[in-house]
Amino acid sequence: MAVVGVGVDVVDVDRFAATLSRTPGIAMRLFTPAERGLARPERLAARFAAKEAVAKVLGAPPGLEWHDAEVVLATGGRPSLRIRGTVAAAAQRLDIASWHLSLTHDGGVAIAMVVAES
């Protein structure tokens, strides 16, 4: 396997929470129903950072749908990516075979790092 791309994103949790509260419907546009179930702002901010990091790995092609990159929990609670639709198509064009995801939130910021391999 070879590294195809690395994406990192940082989100200010308070600013993100304020955006969610003042913009009706934004959570519906950004997150899957399962992701929205994690109502704590720092968890949603980390998942948004992950989606942004995925877009960076893919070169931010136009037309990516936020719901097509979903953060799920793998065995043992480790975060993992489930991709479909527009994200899966962009990943296929880059011959991406596997994804690695790390999330953290502390001190008012949420950070995601994504590594894609062929």
From Swiss-Prot:
Sequence positions that bind Mg(2+): D9, E52
Biological process according to GO: fatty acid biosynthetic process
InterPro entries documented for this protein: 4-PPantetheinyl_Trfase_dom (IPR008278), 4-PPantetheinyl_Trfase_dom_sf (IPR037143), ACPS (IPR002582), Ppantetheine-prot_Trfase_dom (IPR004568)
Reactions performed catalytically: apo-[ACP] + CoA = holo-[ACP] + adenosine 3',5'-bisphosphate + H(+)
Annotated signal sequence range: none
Keyword Zinc tagged: no
GO cellular component, one term: cytoplasm
Keywords: Cytoplasm, Fatty acid biosynthesis, Fatty acid metabolism, Lipid biosynthesis, Lipid metabolism, Magnesium, Metal-binding, Transferase
Enzyme Commission number(s) from the entry: 2.7.8.7
Keyword Oxidoreductase attached: no
GO MF term list: holo-[acyl-carrier-protein] synthase activity; magnesium ion binding
Localisation: Cytoplasm
Cofactor entry: Mg(2+)
Function statement: Transfers the 4'-phosphopantetheine moiety from coenzyme A to a Ser of acyl-carrier-protein.
Family statement drawn from the similarity comment of this UniProt entry: Belongs to the P-Pant transferase superfamily. AcpS family.
Identification of the protein by name: Holo-[acyl-carrier-protein] synthase
